[in-house]
Amino acid sequence: NNLVINSLRNIPNAVSNLLNNNLINVHCQFLVDEIKRKNIENMFILGSGKLFSVAKEGALKIKEISYIHAEAYSAGSLKHGPFALLDNKTIVLLLVTSNNKEKLISTYHEISARNTNCYVLTDIDLDIFKNKIIIPNINYYEEILFVITLQLIAYTLSISREINPDK
Protein backbone atom coordinates (compact mmCIF):
# COMPACT_ATOMS: atom_id res chain seq x y z
CA ASN A 1 0.00 0.00 0.00
CA ASN A 2 1.45 3.36 -1.06
CA LEU A 3 0.12 5.16 2.01
CA VAL A 4 1.96 2.77 4.33
CA ILE A 5 5.20 3.08 2.35
CA ASN A 6 4.93 6.87 2.16
CA SER A 7 4.28 7.03 5.90
CA LEU A 8 7.38 4.91 6.50
CA ARG A 9 9.46 7.19 4.29
CA ASN A 10 8.14 10.23 6.16
CA ILE A 11 9.21 9.01 9.62
CA PRO A 12 12.62 10.80 9.66
CA ASN A 13 10.95 14.11 8.75
CA ALA A 14 8.17 13.53 11.27
CA VAL A 15 10.70 12.83 14.04
CA SER A 16 12.70 15.92 13.13
CA ASN A 17 9.56 18.06 13.09
CA LEU A 18 8.52 16.63 16.45
CA LEU A 19 11.83 17.37 18.14
CA ASN A 20 12.03 20.87 16.65
CA ASN A 21 8.43 21.78 17.46
CA ASN A 22 8.57 24.57 20.05
CA LEU A 23 4.97 24.03 21.15
CA ILE A 24 5.59 20.36 21.93
CA ASN A 25 8.74 21.27 23.84
CA VAL A 26 6.85 23.95 25.80
CA HIS A 27 4.06 21.51 26.70
CA CYS A 28 6.56 18.84 27.75
CA GLN A 29 8.33 21.42 29.92
CA PHE A 30 4.98 22.48 31.41
CA LEU A 31 4.24 18.87 32.38
CA VAL A 32 7.69 18.50 33.91
CA ASP A 33 7.30 21.79 35.81
CA GLU A 34 3.96 20.57 37.20
CA ILE A 35 5.54 17.32 38.35
CA LYS A 36 8.31 19.24 40.08
CA ARG A 37 6.06 21.97 41.53
CA LYS A 38 3.58 19.47 42.97
CA ASN A 39 6.39 17.19 44.16
CA ILE A 40 4.83 14.24 42.37
CA GLU A 41 6.57 10.90 42.76
CA ASN A 42 4.01 8.59 41.10
CA MET A 43 2.96 8.42 37.49
CA PHE A 44 0.68 6.07 35.62
CA ILE A 45 0.84 5.92 31.84
CA LEU A 46 -2.23 4.42 30.20
CA GLY A 47 -2.39 3.14 26.64
CA SER A 48 -4.48 0.69 24.69
CA GLY A 49 -3.69 -1.54 21.74
CA LYS A 50 -0.24 -0.78 20.33
CA LEU A 51 0.05 2.16 22.69
CA PHE A 52 0.07 -0.12 25.74
CA SER A 53 3.59 -1.23 24.74
CA VAL A 54 4.47 2.42 24.20
CA ALA A 55 3.19 3.20 27.72
CA LYS A 56 5.43 0.44 29.12
CA GLU A 57 8.47 1.86 27.33
CA GLY A 58 7.66 5.39 28.52
CA ALA A 59 7.24 4.27 32.14
CA LEU A 60 10.54 2.40 31.99
CA LYS A 61 12.40 5.42 30.63
CA ILE A 62 10.90 7.73 33.24
CA LYS A 63 11.90 5.33 36.04
CA GLU A 64 15.39 4.76 34.65
CA ILE A 65 16.48 8.33 34.13
CA SER A 66 14.38 10.52 36.43
CA TYR A 67 13.87 8.18 39.39
CA ILE A 68 10.13 8.79 39.55
CA HIS A 69 7.87 5.82 40.15
CA ALA A 70 6.09 5.25 36.84
CA GLU A 71 3.92 2.32 35.83
CA ALA A 72 2.15 1.48 32.61
CA TYR A 73 -1.31 -0.01 32.49
CA SER A 74 -3.70 -0.94 29.78
CA ALA A 75 -6.33 1.79 29.75
CA GLY A 76 -9.01 -0.86 30.14
CA SER A 77 -7.54 -2.14 33.40
CA LEU A 78 -7.61 1.19 35.21
CA LYS A 79 -10.34 0.07 37.61
CA HIS A 80 -8.50 -3.17 38.43
CA GLY A 81 -5.31 -1.58 39.65
CA PRO A 82 -4.23 2.03 39.85
CA PHE A 83 -7.72 3.56 40.23
CA ALA A 84 -7.57 3.12 44.01
CA LEU A 85 -4.27 5.02 44.11
CA LEU A 86 -5.41 8.08 42.17
CA ASP A 87 -5.15 11.35 44.06
CA ASN A 88 -3.76 14.87 43.65
CA LYS A 89 -0.18 13.63 44.22
CA THR A 90 -0.35 11.34 41.18
CA ILE A 91 -0.08 12.13 37.50
CA VAL A 92 -1.80 10.05 34.87
CA LEU A 93 -0.65 10.36 31.29
CA LEU A 94 -3.20 9.05 28.78
CA LEU A 95 -2.04 8.05 25.30
CA VAL A 96 -4.89 8.89 22.92
CA THR A 97 -5.24 8.45 19.16
CA SER A 98 -8.21 8.78 16.85
CA ASN A 99 -8.54 4.97 17.06
CA ASN A 100 -9.05 4.82 20.83
CA LYS A 101 -10.48 8.24 21.69
CA GLU A 102 -14.04 7.09 22.45
CA LYS A 103 -12.89 4.65 25.14
CA LEU A 104 -10.39 7.04 26.63
CA ILE A 105 -12.68 10.07 26.88
CA SER A 106 -14.65 8.29 29.60
CA THR A 107 -11.40 7.18 31.24
CA TYR A 108 -10.26 10.82 31.21
CA HIS A 109 -13.47 11.88 32.98
CA GLU A 110 -13.10 9.14 35.60
CA ILE A 111 -9.53 10.19 36.35
CA SER A 112 -10.36 13.90 36.47
CA ALA A 113 -13.26 13.24 38.86
CA ARG A 114 -10.75 11.81 41.37
CA ASN A 115 -8.89 15.15 41.54
CA THR A 116 -5.92 13.52 39.84
CA ASN A 117 -3.52 15.38 37.57
CA CYS A 118 -4.36 14.08 34.12
CA TYR A 119 -2.39 14.86 30.97
CA VAL A 120 -3.05 13.58 27.49
CA LEU A 121 -0.43 12.74 24.88
CA THR A 122 -2.34 12.67 21.61
CA ASP A 123 -2.18 13.06 17.86
CA ILE A 124 -5.66 14.63 17.69
CA ASP A 125 -6.79 17.98 19.08
CA LEU A 126 -9.92 17.58 21.18
CA ASP A 127 -11.12 20.48 23.32
CA ILE A 128 -12.34 18.05 25.97
CA PHE A 129 -8.77 17.40 27.12
CA LYS A 130 -7.53 20.23 29.34
CA ASN A 131 -3.81 19.47 29.60
CA LYS A 132 -2.47 17.91 26.43
CA ILE A 133 0.60 17.49 24.32
CA ILE A 134 -0.38 17.23 20.67
CA ILE A 135 2.04 15.42 18.41
CA PRO A 136 1.86 15.15 14.61
CA ASN A 137 -0.51 12.58 13.15
CA ILE A 138 1.36 10.43 10.63
CA ASN A 139 -1.43 7.91 9.88
CA TYR A 140 0.73 4.80 10.30
CA TYR A 141 3.55 4.20 12.75
CA GLU A 142 2.23 6.87 15.13
CA GLU A 143 3.56 4.86 18.05
CA ILE A 144 7.09 5.93 17.07
CA LEU A 145 6.25 9.58 17.74
CA PHE A 146 4.54 8.66 21.01
CA VAL A 147 7.68 6.79 22.19
CA ILE A 148 9.96 9.67 21.26
CA THR A 149 7.74 12.19 23.05
CA LEU A 150 7.74 10.04 26.19
CA GLN A 151 11.54 9.83 25.96
CA LEU A 152 11.65 13.62 25.64
CA ILE A 153 9.49 13.96 28.76
CA ALA A 154 11.76 11.53 30.65
CA TYR A 155 14.88 13.42 29.54
CA THR A 156 13.41 16.82 30.43
CA LEU A 157 12.27 15.49 33.80
CA SER A 158 15.73 14.10 34.51
CA ILE A 159 17.43 17.40 33.67
CA SER A 160 14.94 19.38 35.78
CA ARG A 161 15.68 17.10 38.75
CA GLU A 162 19.43 17.61 38.16
CA ILE A 163 19.96 13.95 37.37
CA ASN A 164 22.39 13.00 34.62
CA PRO A 165 20.25 11.00 32.16
CA ASP A 166 23.33 9.21 30.80
CA LYS A 167 24.26 7.49 34.08
Predicted regions and their residues:
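A SIS-like phosphosugar-recognition module
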Residues: 1-167
